[in-house]
Amino acid sequence: MQWEVVIGLETHTQLTTKTKIFSGSPTRFGAAPNTQTSPVDLALPGALPVMNRSAVERAIQFGLAIGATIAPYSVFARKNYFYPDLPKGYQISQMDLPIVQGGRVSFAMEVDGKTEIRSVQLTRAHLEEDAGKSLHEDYHGMTGIDLNRAGTPLLEIVTEPDMRSAAEAVAYAKALHTLVTWIGICDGNMQEGSFRCDANVSVRPVGQKEYGTRCEIKNLNSFRFMEDAINYEVRRQIELIEDGGRVVQATRLYDPDKKETREMRSKENAHDYRYFPDPDLPPLVVSAEWITRVQAEMPELPGAMRERFTREYGLSDYDAAVLTQSKAMANYFELICSIAGHEQAKPAANLLMGDVASAVNRDGIELDAAPVSAAQLAVLLHRIADGTISNKIAKEVFGAMWEAKSDSPTIADELIESKGLKQISDSGALEKIVDDVLAANTKSVEEFRAGKEQAINALMGQAMKASKGKANPAQLTELLKKKLSA
């Protein structure tokens, strides 16, 4: 039997407000336990919540970014459940009338070697408060409660069950991560829990309209874990059904060490939480004027920039998609092009996606902290374009520039000169190299003249080796062909 996978994601994004959603307590990460709390966060009698305007504005920004409907009137509700790190005995959230309704997130993904633009429909995005934290490992035989996180503002973003593979779910999650960090509503730090996903996974026979029984995998805080967890859960459900069993609706956790999911508890439905409107908070009213003001302050979005990069710079869909995965990368690319010229767009993209990205990842730094400026890279690109150095030598020069950490705008020229890396373009010098190589490699010469055209590659390699990589490849190839055909 052929199976179809059905996936929906719920993503909790921690909003970048300085204070909590219903109190004036700070939201800084890493403070000593229970030092960032207030009577509201601790649920002391008589303490009343007050809505954080900045949290609402960030929700409006997100709604505008995905083309959603911003509800002019939305309501907060109490989600009732007991947990030690939830002092009120309920979480303030939104149920029937969320602030953001509908919308769509588009993203690029590789399918069979081709770049496809796909999109996922969103059901809603609603504001809510985070719970505190239970600390199980810090105390022997006891659990500590840290309420610093209680009341931190969250925007929970819920998709329709539109995704059909773990790879597609990860591509969507990465695009969402890019979007919320791009517009500045979330810092996207998955290790600190600022961006965490729950995946609802089910399977059904191909062609069946009804959905299968879903299981929710909670708190996936890395894209790799998300893909592994979904793939495992899909295999588990299919094997269970094919062995005559049935999938039971449940909440599950992913164990990255064992690479498997395990049941945490039976899966609740909305009625289990007994939602009802919170009497301490008035309805949230968002005026058209407020939306217009927020819209005027919105930056160019990743999707629009991706399309502009293909149109304005002639980049492929793939290159444009990679460059717009991060606002820092996109801005860096445009700055290089503004200095080096649009004709250097493709070489600039290759340099950023290759050597620069590799160096940033190797050193574990952010692109903003890169020791090589856009102006310095523009000079390097010009030296490749004017034939001063080859692409191969450019890699060596870039590595030296990265290590030098120099402020000099002409560091590329200085390194090329001091290391003697200028490309050999003198016809006399190249001719001597070619003559020596042909004389020393008579077998390859005979093979080429006998019709084995790839034999020229061996000769080219020997010639480049003889020149210590400094020969102009185009001139060298032309000269080799001319001599071999004589």
UniProtKB/Swiss-Prot annotation:
Coiled coil: none annotated. One of its GO terms (molecular function) is ATP binding. Belongs to the GatB/GatE family. GatB subfamily. PANTHER family: GLUTAMYL-TRNA GLN AMIDOTRANSFERASE SUBUNIT B MITOCHONDRIAL AND PROKARYOTIC PET112-RELATED, GLUTAMYL-TRNA(GLN) AMIDOTRANSFERASE SUBUNIT B, MITOCHONDRIAL. It comes from Herminiimonas arsenicoxydans. Transmembrane segments: none annotated. InterPro entries: Asn/Gln-tRNA_amidoTrfase_suB/E (IPR017959), Asn/Gln-tRNA_Trfase_suB/E_cat (IPR006075), Asn/Gln_amidotransferase (IPR018027), Asn/Gln_tRNA_amidoTrase-B-like (IPR003789), GatB (IPR004413), GatB_C_1 (IPR042114), GatB_Yqey_C_2 (IPR023168), Gln-tRNA_amidoTrfase_suB_CS (IPR017958). Heterotrimer of A, B and C subunits. Allows the formation of correctly charged Asn-tRNA(Asn) or Gln-tRNA(Gln) through the transamidation of misacylated Asp-tRNA(Asn) or Glu-tRNA(Gln) in organisms which lack either or both of asparaginyl-tRNA or glutaminyl-tRNA synthetases. The reaction takes place in the presence of glutamine and ATP through an activated phospho-Asp-tRNA(Asn) or phospho-Glu-tRNA(Gln). It catalyses: L-glutamyl-tRNA(Gln) + L-glutamine + ATP + H2O = L-glutaminyl-tRNA(Gln) + L-glutamate + ADP + phosphate + H(+); L-aspartyl-tRNA(Asn) + L-glutamine + ATP + H2O = L-asparaginyl-tRNA(Asn) + L-glutamate + ADP + phosphate + 2 H(+). This is Aspartyl/glutamyl-tRNA(Asn/Gln) amidotransferase subunit B. The lineage of its organism: Bacteria, Pseudomonadati, Pseudomonadota, Betaproteobacteria, Burkholderiales. Keywords: ATP-binding, Ligase, Nucleotide-binding, Protein biosynthesis. The keyword Plastid does not apply. Its EC number is 6.3.5.-. It is an enzyme of class 6 (ligase). It comes from the Bacteria. SMART domains: GatB_Yqey.
